[in-house]
Amino acid sequence: MKNLLYVVLLMAVCILGLLIVGTIFYLFLEVFMYFYVNAPISLESFQFTRLLKMSIYGGGILGLGIGLLRIFKIKGF
């Protein structure tokens, strides 16, 4: 039971981390495009929903993989 809680907590941390990194990257990319290409800043909702889906799936898989490797005591984790 303790191992399952560990995996779920690790998945949540990975999801949140990827969401924060992805949001910062997306905002910096919009600012870069505004200053260097003179493209208008367009913060569209479908971009954020796509970013949320990517962070949930990617962070979930990453957290699950790291958690399982740690539970099975694979070297390096």
UniProtKB/Swiss-Prot annotation:
Gene Ontology, cellular component aspect: membrane
Alphabetical UniProt keywords: Membrane, Transmembrane, Transmembrane helix
Membrane association type: Multi-pass membrane protein
Record gene name: cdiI
Assembly: Probably interacts with cognate toxin CdiA.
Protein name per the record: Immunity protein CdiI
Main location: membrane
Subcellular location: Membrane
Membrane-spanning parts: 8-28, 54-74
Keyword match Cytoplasm: no
Function: Immunity protein component of a toxin-immunity protein module, which functions as a cellular contact-dependent growth inhibition (CDI) system. CDI modules allow bacteria to communicate with and inhibit the growth of closely related neighboring bacteria in a contact-dependent fashion. Protects cells against the CDI activity of CdiA, its cognate toxin protein, but not against non-cognate CdiA from E.coli strains 563, EC93 or D.dadantii strain 3937.
